[in-house]
């Protein structure tokens, strides 16, 4: 690990100013993504701006008909929050599936979204629920925020402050995980919202999280796993690696989408 200067701002504004003044500075919260690559000397940011001590940035609360989760809320806090469990149980369940206890106690929702790992779980929930990513500068919809593998719309001095999740009538997340890393080989989040149905997939796309529009159209007519019978997913544009071929992932997506709908309807 190379030498760096550590900053511990007390407010989001102070953090943003530090990022603006220090070229190549990096934000850190839980550190589960950045610290390992720094140890391997694959990254050597001269400045680290730690958000974990900013008061209120991990707050979880209801705001009208939306669930607000602060950027530094850990996976453990999301998974075990009574507010999240009551408002969107599927989101609490998703957070409880992430990594192992050590990862869940340190990793944060904001860090996961900012990193935009193509196998991460939260992007599927954000996309399916139509959440809004709030930063110190603006509000972004999922389609604006996610811009490809490990790429987002965040500017160099822009910081995620919270995520606003609209409530869904029914929702569920199902994933087939890599047994070693527990990352999603394929993960499918299904959400029946007041106005529509959205089905989002993580872990499989060569360009990150994406939606299954054909499945959404079928489920709008009738929210039942039976309407998905006969629907398939094209392997075109899907990942193919040592963990599974594109064809295998395409099959998994269709299977998990049905299971997610079954899980969502079983909670009635």
Give, region by region, the residue ranges found by the protein language model:
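C-terminal structural segment of proteins
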Residues: 1-268
């Amino acid at each position: 690990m190379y030498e760096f200067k550590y900053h511990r701002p007390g407010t989001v504004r102070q953090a943003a100013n530090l990022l603006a003044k220090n070229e190549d500075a990096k934000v850190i919260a839980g550190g589960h993504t950045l610290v390992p690559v720094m140890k391997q000397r694959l990254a050597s940011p001269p400045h680290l701006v730690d958000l974990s001590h900013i008061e209120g940035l991990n707050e979880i609360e209801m705001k009208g008909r939306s669930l607000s989760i602060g950027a530094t809320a850990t996976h453990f806090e999301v998974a075990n929050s009574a507010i999240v469990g009551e408002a969107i149980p599927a989101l609490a369940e998703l957070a409880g599936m992430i990594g192992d206890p050590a990862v869940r106690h340190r990793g944060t929702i904001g860090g996961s979204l900012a990193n935009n790992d193509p196998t991460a779980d939260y992007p599927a929930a954000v996309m399916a629920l139509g959440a809004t990513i709030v930063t110190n500068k603006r509000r972004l919809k999922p389609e604006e925020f996610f811009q490809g593998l490990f790429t987002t719309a965040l500017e160099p001095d822009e910081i995620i402050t919270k995520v606003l999740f609209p409530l869904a009538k029914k929702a569920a997340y199902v994933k087939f995980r890599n047994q070693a890393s527990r990352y999603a080989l394929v993960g499918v989040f299904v959400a029946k919202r007041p106005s529509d149905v959205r089905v989002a997939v993580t872990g499989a796309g060569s360009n990150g999280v994406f939606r299954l529009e054909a499945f959404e159209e079928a489920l709008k007519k009738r929210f039942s796993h039976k309407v998905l019978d006969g629907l398939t997913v094209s392997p075109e544009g899907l990942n193919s690696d040592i963990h599974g071929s594109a064809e295998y992932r395409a099959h998994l997506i269709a299977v998990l989408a049905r299971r997610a709908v079954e899980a969502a309807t079983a909670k009635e």
